[in-house]
């Protein structure tokens, strides 16, 4: 991949160069020392991937990410000195379209752990995502389960741009919303707890991480919280699984949506928000085929129009809506939750 580096610290740039040099398939295309220069470089020489710092002069990493995604979209990985200490900025950057975040590697060679490996793992993961052209294979469909006395389930998938889209959606829901919500957002497990707390600050409904054995409850939002795939079991409870192993992103939206089709015995609504790639498109299609109402975010309001675009292209969405209309549509649908939504 051709990689752009955005960082104003010479030692950090050198550490990034050395890490990239470990893989012959990658090369440094350019180095920018602030967000304004990065935007100019992205327009003039579009990279496959940008390694974006957060704290820089003139234009910071969050603003630069937003500007790049508006004018010259590409994959962006936040690489900063201390991700944990900058968690709120990380979520803002991911809301603007960044795919993930990782600490800047150091030049120190002491110790048993290789400081370059976390960054290389993230680059490899994004490389697989960019290389994916075919949709993921769908799990075999189970026979439709009889409907039971369960709350409606709103299954939501999101990736790049998701944090901002999720806050905009959740804050529009009433605090007595009578459905259960489960979110699969492409985010590393290191950030999941912090993201749940961050979303909780915007949402009238409580937002918690989904744990092994959690049961979706009306009026509660559960967020996938590990690098394994969140799914519903045959008992209708949430669990995590490593399979399928080869997926561009973990957790997978497709895996969760297919498990809703197979194992949720009540009504369900599928929502696919902004994101890069195709994850969730096949699962949303399966939900619609099962008779559930499905929504894809429109292009105009998506930070990255990849996942919802793929869903719309295969007829997976009952409706393609701007972000600001999705909450109202959910409220309306849940009020009529015993009707057939097709």
UniProtKB/Swiss-Prot annotation:
List locations, semicolon-separated.
Cytoplasm
- Active site location: 159, 186, 279
| CDD domains xrefs | CheB_Rec, REC_CheB-like
The protein's Enzyme Commission number: 3.1.1.61, 3.5.1.44
- Residues in domain Response regulatory? 2-119
Q: Which Pfam families match?
A: CheB_methylest, Response_reg
- Give the matching Gene3D superfamilies: 3.40.50.2300, Methylesterase CheB, C-terminal domain (3.40.50.180)
Keyword Iron-sulfur in record? no
Q: What class of enzyme is it?
A: hydrolase
**HAMAP family in alphabetical order:** CheB_chemtxs (MF_00099)
What protein name applies here?
A: Protein-glutamate methylesterase/protein-glutamine glutaminase 2
Say which species the protein is native to.
Burkholderia mallei (strain ATCC 23344)
